[in-house]
A protein has these predicted regions:
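Residues forming the flavin
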Residues: 1-314
Length: 315
């Protein structure tokens, strides 16, 4: 890219899309050298998951035709490795999907990490969310994975990202700014988890600074009911998954960009503004680099190469 004359700017935030009438004229950015405007005949926006809130705001401010996308609200589940060995021995990352009663919303597992570690991530604005990863050499006695409930909104409320952020903020407030952890058995009993109980648990938390508490005090009823019933169903095929000692960390949130209306050449309703859809490719390449999985980075590079070959209009 540098050899082709591309100007790459690091530690620089895009603060605004510049429009005149129904046409995009460029963007405003803010970096180490201060704020400035970059004018262009064509502007490509490719924010990824972390910029979903920013993209939503730009769509509303500039009248960019879009529809609200889904948001995933859930928990990070941690069990002993032996509980998941029937899955881990066959698949590095098993995918389980269910539609539990009474709501029949889609609930799925995601980002399974055998011998992995639960971790904390901080989004812009200080929102603390839970995640998980694994290392090639260093292993724990536990397996962690996400259990996510997909939420869709339409009328009259159509701000799923803001909704999930509020869930995260409330959970952070109960956890004194950090991640909450609770034993599954305590959820079934309708009680919080205490530090002493956590220390005596057979499943030792790999996120040492997680705060023992009550995630049900912050999790919406619909999402919590879906998660509990899904885990009980999974326990039928993976015995021990819904054991009383199983740990649940919250909040695990996955933000997705709005579904911006665009044509086959990625053009939006605003002239000169194009949209790049790299979320899945970026996530897969990032996962390989983050957790040290064998071949992860090569997989990401192959995915990017396939994307380039299949989407020549973007060039």
């Amino acid at each position: 890219l540098l050899d082709a004359g591309v100007d790459m700017r690091f530690r620089t935030s895009c603060t605004q899309v510049l429009t005149e009438g129904d046409a995009c004229m460029g963007v405003a950015v803010d970096g180490p050298d201060g704020p400035c405007e970059i004018r262009a005949r064509q502007t490509v926006v490719a924010t990824g998951r972390r910029g979903a809130d920013w993209l939503d705001r730009m769509c509303r401010e500039h009248g960019i035709a879009h529809r609200a996308g889904p948001v995933d609200i859930g928990v990070r589940v941690e069990v002993r490795n032996e509980v998941m060995e029937t899955v881990n021995d066959v698949l590095y990352e098993g995918k389980l999907v269910g539609y539990p009663l009474p709501f029949k919303n889609k609930v799925r597992t995601f980002c399974q990490n055998p011998g992995g570690f639960v971790s904390q991530e901080n989004y812009d604005g200080g929102l603390a969310v839970v995640n998980g990863h694994s290392y090639k050499e260093r292993k724990s006695p536990n397996t962690n994975l996400a259990v996510l409930c997909s939420q869709n909104f339409s009328v009259p409320f159509d701000q799923p990202i803001a909704y999930a952020q509020k869930v995260g903020e409330l959970t952070n407030m109960l956890g004194d700014g950090g991640i909450l952890v609770q034993r599954f058995g305590d959820i079934l009993d309708g009680k919080r988890t205490w530090d002493k109980e956590l220390r005596q648990s057979n499943v030792a938390p790999t996120l040492a600074d997680a705060v023992a508490g009550d995630i049900t005090a912050a999790m919406p009823y619909r999402a919590m009911t879906n998660i509990v019933n899904f885990m009980l169903a999974v326990d039928e095929v993976v015995p021990g998954f819904a054991a009383r000692e199983t740990l649940l960390y919250s909040p695990e949130l996955k933000f997705y960009s709005n579904r911006v209306d665009m044509d086959a050449r990625f053009r939006t309703s605003v002239s000169g503004l194009l949209l790049g859809r790299f979320e899945r490719v970026d996530a897969r390449a990032h996962d390989g680099e983050r957790d040290g999985r064998s071949g992860g980075q090569d997989h990401g590079r192959r995915a990017l190469n396939r994307y380039d070959a299949a989407h020549t209009p973007f060039a």
